[in-house]
Amino acid sequence: SYMISKLNIKDNDIILEPSAGEGIFIDGIINQQKNIQIDALDIDEKAVNILKKKYWDMPNVKVRLTDTLLDRQLDMYADRQLWLKITDTLEDKELDYISDNGGYYDKIIGNPPYGAWQDYDKRKILKKKYKGQYVKETYTLFLYRCIFLLKKGGKLSFIIPDTFLFLNMHKSLREFLLKSTKIEEILIFPSNFFPGVNFGYSNLSIITLEKDDCESVKDNDVKIFTGFNTVRELGRIDENSENLQCFCYKQSDILKNENYKFIITDNSKIAIINDSKVRIGDVADVVTGFYSGNNKEFICVKSKEIKGAKNYRMVDCDKIYDCYDLTGIKNVAEGYVAYVKGSSDTRYIRKEDEWYVRWDKETVDFYIKDKKARFQNSKFYFKTGIAIPMVKSKQIKATLMRNRVFDQSIVGIFPKGKDKIYYMLALMNSNVI
């Protein structure tokens, strides 16, 4: 596969697959018939049992049931910087030797989990261990963790969502990547290239990098490829496909961007963005919305014809209420309110309400207490603002939002001056943006 070819695997390499799953990458590596050692880890007991049966006669493939993010054996392999975040004192001479040699693995490959729920107790542990990192997202922690496990000069290739490139919550990770690795290549492509995967709000990416903390990493050129139409094109970027675009940036230039964001456009537009004295956050509150914790249970659709409505229940029209109360609809056993979710076919005004969220008082009380639900930025629910779906599109379709709860996949823009609402709505829908 493309990812395996990017690692340039050699005899005697020690390789890690931190979320081995069915062993697809392992099979590809074994087919190269190299004299290598593979550590295959997974948190799922069923997957591990399958892997052990699959590779029972291969002593060079070691399968372990473990949580990669908290595994103590991997802690021993990580370089000194992460150890100091795990504990205050580490005096073991053998571990010092491993640390001084900069990690343990020559190559790391994987498709780490994303969006996995972390309970609050585990979050506390992860916050202590991975200081400064956003611990609610697993894939970024896997990336951060695995770079520490690489030897200097070791290579990593991961397939992960592309949100680490631009979301503010991943600022610290981007800085770490740009200062501690040479990023060779990033491919960005639709998530629906792979069966059963379709984020809607982001693309997938394949990142290939080499661990190197020298000052020279800042002079490294990062190549970013976009415009893929089919999954087959992922392995054919050298064939000069007409639809592919290649952007090349020095890591030092990306470090100059606000929050170290990967702004994927031509350099003249990057300069305009970086030189701007007024940002949208200066004139408006920009927030994401609500998550029920179990959308199939609490979210309904008006019609099965709506995009993304598969497996959702249709709403009972007799249970829809005009309620704008954060505490929920009172004196009803089951009630729903209009919900802003998904993309819009039109700009400025959505044609009709298509989604509904359960909002009776008992259910709202449940959301507030439930560990999986996110009753976030609730002071903006039912307010007047602008809704922009977090979907990849050639054209932004911003719509007016009044008296609605909005989904976490929606960016809500709430101008600090009420007289600016229509100006900003027009601006967001203009060709300038």
Where are the model-predicted features located?
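Conserved hydrophobic residues forming the short capping helix/wall of the S-adenosyl-L-methionine
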Residues: 55
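Signature of N6-adenine DNA methyltransferases within the class I
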Residues: 1-2, 6, 15, 19-36, ...
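Conserved beta-strand scaffold positions in the cores of enzyme catalytic domains, especially
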Residues: 63, 186, 339-340
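Phosphate-coordination loops involved in phosphoryl transfer and adenosine-cofactor binding
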Residues: 12
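A positively charged, amphipathic N-terminal helix/segment that binds anionic biomolecules
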Residues: 9
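Polybasic, glycine- and aromatic-enriched phosphate-binding surface used to engage nucleic acids
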Residues: 147, 272, 276-433
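Generic solvent-exposed, charged/amphipathic alpha-helical segments
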Residues: 52, 174, 425-429
